[in-house]
Amino acid sequence: MEETKVKRTCLERTVCSSKAKEDLISQLPDSLITQILFYLQTKKAVTTSVLSKRWRSLWLSTPGLVLISNDFTDYNAFVSFVDKFLGFSREQKLCLHKLKLSIRKGENDQDCVTRWIDFVATPKLKHLDVEIGPTRCECFEVIPLSLYSCESLLYLRLNHVCLGKFESVSLPCLKTMSLEQNIYANEADLESLISTCPVLEDLSFVSGAYDKVNVLRVQSQTLTSLNIEGCVEYLDLDKSEVLIDATRLKYLNLEADQYESKTIRNSGSLTKVNLLGYFHMKNNDDDDEVDLQKRDMVHNFFTSISGVSDMKISSQAFALFIMNTMPFSPKFCNLSCLEVEIFLPSLETLPTFLESFPNLKSLILGLRYWTPKKELRLSFVPRCLLSSLEFVEIKGCSRSNMERVKYVGEPIETKLARYFVENSTILKKLVLPLRSSTPEEIYSVDFWNFLEFPRRSSICQITYVAGL
């Protein structure tokens, strides 16, 4: 009897606790609930409408819309949903703070993005992200002029749209802008869009097949991070140029770009640079004068970034550096971290290359196969091995698809590893990937031979990592 009473008391407490929690939620004002729903993807926010009658239309009052067209049965259903949502917002005189759309449309699908953006482009809009799936340039939708005067806009990402001519830009709060594979009225308007954002800090520009931006000028007094990427196959290469003038720029990423000329001015704030993928500068020419111009251009470019402390470069950028700056290459005295890809035939130039980084502490090498392996001779010892290098990691790449492979014991890799441990005076760690994780491979003769390398540094450890 007593036990039953205790159970009943516990049950009553549980029910009361549940009711208290339910009452707590129900006591929240609609404005707070809609703010909570704002942080959900719209598809998930809509599902809350089944909770109760009160929740049935609360999601319609959220100040944000995040939708993916592929989540709907077809494109027309997607358009109808967005139109109804914006229609409700218009009737209730609501202003959206955020609009994020990921759209996949065909050539015959109706245009709608222009009018949607025009509706949400109010002084209260803070976040706009529009991505339209790969489509022909004839299907690109035009950005309305109203967007260029959103005074509260903080974040802007535009993908596969058309930016027409405009008379003025007023985006006083915009800090992050990403322009990806769009069409621009002309190069001057693109330059103006970038330079007239007074607090812009983060800019990403991805070139596309239709943008026809032969000269990209990035001028800003506030920019701290810049990303430029994309394969610009349709450029007039002889006249293509990227000019960067950003006094506060700290991070620069150039990836798979083919601009003939690259100029960086006022680069004193740069700390990290990535030169990735296909890195191109001026076609080779038999004309000695043209070849001299290219050497000067490449030398000036690397000199302009020589103050960085962290750099990552592709095999193409490495080749450009070796062929066009030696023997008077710029010194990267502040550089402590370097990651570089190298084709195996170019490995013999590695010591000379490393001489440009006298205070290097960390080195990551990605090896790329190109021709059959040959005898590797490394005799010269650069200054950084004798004074500063503490960490080395060697990564391998397959010959066919350039993907990383697991290896130990290959002649070139063995000699390269031996070169570092025998010549680095303060090396703390050498990291090598295993060719196999089987016990037979791990405890093979080659494995133990690596561990028995004579080491110039008494504190050097050799580490194997499976699966790199």
UniProtKB/Swiss-Prot annotation:
F-box domain segment(s): 22-68
Residue ranges annotated for the FBD domain, each copy included: 375-433
Matching PROSITE patterns: FBOX
CDD domains reported for this sequence: F-box_AtFBL13-like
Name the UniProt record assigns to this protein: Putative FBD-associated F-box protein At5g22720
Organism (species): Arabidopsis thaliana
